[in-house]
Amino acid sequence: MKRFLLCSFALVLLYPAGIDMYLVGLPRIAADLNASEAQLHIAFSVYLAGMATAMLFAGKIADQSGRKPVAIVGALVFMMASLLCSRASEGSLFLSGRFLQGVGAGGCYVVAFAILRDTLDEHRRAKVLSLLNGITCIVPVLAPVVGHLIMLRFPWQSLFYTMSAMGIIVGLLSLFILRETRPVRLAPRDLSRSSPAAESLINRFFVSRLAITTLSVSVILTFVNASPVLLMEVMGFSRGDYAITMALTAGVSMVVSFSTPFALGLFKPRTLMLVSQGLFLTAGVTLSLAHTNTVTLFGLTLICAGFSVGFGVAMSQALGPFSLRAGVASSTLGIAQVCGSSLWIWLAAILGISAMNMLIGILIGCSIVSILLIFSVTPNRSVAEHEEIPYQSRP
């Protein structure tokens, strides 16, 4: 079991590392490529577009051909794309490399969740996904620091050499440590009820959890996107103050994420999901009424706590109905989360909504819709029947 957890964590970490590690070198990259920082900021959207593109195909391929081949290819693509970025001499080539980085990270991301669905029951999976969320929160804090230390002695290309090395490590783990977990066959008693056709993506429970997780990701990405404006322009923080504040909020996320597995031993998953949405609602109300920086910071802290306590649980429930189509389900969740959050941020920008109102709107909207879905759509017998790990996996 340890090998599956190690490989899943490594596969997931390529995604945030690809986003955060290069940011510290952006001014120097822009200067060397004769591009403005504003032009290169589109690299974030290009990276997410690459992830979404990979997710369209990676899940189905993983269900048909296996988790291991997709993981190896994804890591290889990430490694080669990182080298392409390091060799870029102009902006378009750099953006092409960023897109391919997203493709590699997206394939690995999908496979990681499929592996956890294959190997863990609902209770253990919810705990592991909460821990995974906590570990993921470390990357946005550590990656810029590591990037800064690297650039003290080496050029910006070394950032992408480092990411390329990460791709190699993940590829080697996938090749030599990871075992195939795609279901080969089910027990005879399960054949009548467990088939790819029976595991439809269009069922009320899955759609409800897809909506909850998509709205939750929209909240956290809106917070990340709006935080520079809120903290440095509206609240008057310096860059140093901003970095410290974001590190503290990441610390809150880590503490709550690592505490959630213990909370699952005391409370039902539904209770934690309601607590999560209650924190979002409280954060939205707090930010709308805040007149001091202290109150605003308290509201921002509630956002991080709310996301950390509920997201892993909701993701675990969303994957529960799928024993044979875990890859497709994971892809669908990833695509919805990436595209849904990007759509909200884009629409808010087009409509001229301020950073604070953008954040308040998604907090209140997410909490109300999610609470209604949690109360109105509960796991039915069909979902419970599919909630089991595969009978046999390949060695």
Curated annotation (Swiss-Prot):
GO biological process, one term: xenobiotic detoxification by transmembrane export across the plasma membrane
Main location, first listed in the record: membrane
Pfam families: MFS_1
Localization in the cell: Cell inner membrane
Transmembrane segments: 4-24, 42-62, 69-89, 93-113, 131-151, 158-178, 217-237, 247-267, 271-291, 295-315, 328-350, 355-377
Keywords associated with the record: Cell inner membrane, Cell membrane, Membrane, Transmembrane, Transmembrane helix, Transport
HAMAP family recorded: MFS_MdtL
Protein name: Multidrug resistance protein MdtL
Protein's organism: Salmonella typhimurium (strain LT2 / SGSC1412 / ATCC 700720)
